[in-house]
Amino acid sequence: MPYIPHTPEELQEMLSVVGVRDLDGLFADIPPEMRPKQFNLPKGQSEAAVCAYFEGLAAKNCPDLVSFLGAGYYAHDIPKAVDALAGRSEFYTSYTPYQPECSQGTLQAIFEFQTAISRLLGMDCANASVYDGGTAIFEAAMMAVRSTRRRVLVVDEAVNPIWRVMLASYISSLDLELKTVQQEKGVSRLDALMAAIDDTTAAVIVQNPNFFGAVADYTQVFAKARAHKAFGVISVYPVMQSVLKTPGEMGADVAVAEGQSIGMPLSFGGPYLGLMTCRKEHIRQFPGRIVGRTTDVDGKTGYVLTLQAREQHIRRAKATSNICSNQALCALRALIHLSLLGPCGLTRLAENNMALTRYAVERLTSIKGIELLNDAPYGNEVALRLPMPAQMLVDALSAHGCVPGYPLGRYYPGMEDVLLLACTERNSRQQIGMLAETVGGLL
């Protein structure tokens, strides 16, 4: 049976209101040669057939694999209270409320989220979230372009390649220049980044730890950017922020992150969470919702959407961004997750994962032919050079129920023999030992 709620009479009534005769008239502005002649879609199926099809797709997943995958998305333990609280009907929406008098609980939760993220990254202000880490980098770049009225973006090649592709796609029709500074053996070249900054630069964009897991201090890079009145933008890994120098301490203008690691399970395509923070002086160029705390006429504390003149529903085409609804439910999960861990718990988590990674490096580099790609400091993720193609190792071990890491040759030509390995609290020393023994046996 069809699940179309409108009768033919209702459809005709709607068409007459907009002034067209039929459905084709709605698309008259699109030239016929630009319209698809047919869609490569299967014929309609019964409910049972559709369920069977998707169950077959789901059965291809391998939830029992021992995984050392990272590359920007990480398998962390999530307290059960996160699901229990975020799943309450009062919160279960991605939409930001416009009517503060009806939604004080949701607004306060977003305000507390902003406070937590600002403190975690050491920055002045945070927004209510954007879609994901890649979107956050683009929005930060556009903040810089609007503020500086410049067209050149300097990007470190060691920034997550997925996010760099997203950035390039977003700006492809905006007459902006993307200037990529090459990494060297997985290490960001700070001197080259500083040399690339001049009076035409809108922003310099870096990542810490970078995609290869290498940790660096970008204070001098941001100082050079500020000297040329350009923005310093940095993407970070939230869990590692409890033990690393914060973006605020480095002097960043905008700090962003993929928030999946704090409260979101791994999922193909999301939903994930884009974190955005900035210095107070840039807040009027900030995209998305911002919740503020105020006092009403009776002296009671209240929470409201503030600085709305930046937004699409007010400024329309002149808004700072076309983002409307944000990832409010994912932001709530992140807030609950951080609150349950607390500052000490988050620090212990990062230290535990770093210790596991050091142990993995110790075991694997004791195997002949395996070595660190570089001698840079690392956190819970590290690049290893192998005596064989990394993809071959991944394929061989996956057949035995273990994914040893990510083959970097997929994104970086010439690094076909480099494996990116990450450890979280979901891994154990026993699993690392089994990984080392299996790899040693194959080599």
From Swiss-Prot:
Entry-linked Gene3D superfamilies: Aspartate Aminotransferase, domain 1 (3.90.1150.10), Type I PLP-dependent aspartate aminotransferase-like (Major domain) (3.40.640.10)
EC category name: oxidoreductase
EC number: 1.4.4.2
Pfam families (alphabetical): GDC-P
Claim: Hydrolase is one of the keywords in the record: no
GO MF term list: glycine dehydrogenase (decarboxylating) activity
Function per UniProt: The glycine cleavage system catalyzes the degradation of glycine. The P protein binds the alpha-amino group of glycine through its pyridoxal phosphate cofactor; CO(2) is released and the remaining methylamine moiety is then transferred to the lipoamide cofactor of the H protein.
Subunit-level organization: The glycine cleavage system is composed of four proteins: P, T, L and H. In this organism, the P 'protein' is a heterodimer of two subunits.
Name of the protein: Probable glycine dehydrogenase (decarboxylating) subunit 1
Species name: Desulfovibrio desulfuricans (strain ATCC 27774 / DSM 6949 / MB)
